[in-house]
Amino acid sequence: MVGIPGVGKSTLLTTMVEILKNHKKNVIVINYGSLMFDVATKNGLKDRDDLRKLSVSEQQRLQKLAAETIATHNEEIVIIDTHAFINSPEGYYPGLPEHVLKIIKPSNFVSVSAKPEEIYNRRMKDDTRNRDKITLANI
């Protein structure tokens, strides 16, 4: 499941998982950025939101390691929560580039969208993350 930051992916996933579990499905949600951060902390990264500030080559390396971990999961339903694009110092980079898709081999792809005003308001209220400031016009 992909979407831009603040679109509501994680909130939607909470409801989806509850419904799936009520239907006796074995489901796991993996936040791709959190998995990448787990690996990056071993190399000294302190803030999850600094992942996007790494070079694209380092992001690619972390994405590959995270994808290899995801590919080992054997739950009936594995849902990946990630961003469609990451705003990096080298420009926008896909959250699920081709080299990752070849490893995880997804069977479905869901893109979440919302009105820019809703996204902006969610981002402004979220004090749990160290997000880059953005204007409504840029969303």
Q: Where is each model-derived feature located?
A:
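Hydrophobic anchor at the beta1->P-loop junction of P-loop NTPases
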Residues: 1
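P-loop (Walker A) phosphate-binding loop of NTP-binding proteins
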Residues: 4
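ATP-binding Walker
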Residues: 7
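Walker A/P-loop
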Residues: 10
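ATP-dependent small-molecule kinase phosphotransfer cores
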Residues: 28, 32-94
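ATP-dependent NMP and nucleoside kinases share a basic, alpha-helical "lid"
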Residues: 82-126
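Small-molecule kinase domains that catalyze NTP-dependent phosphoryl transfer to phosphate-bearing small molecules
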Residues: 124-139
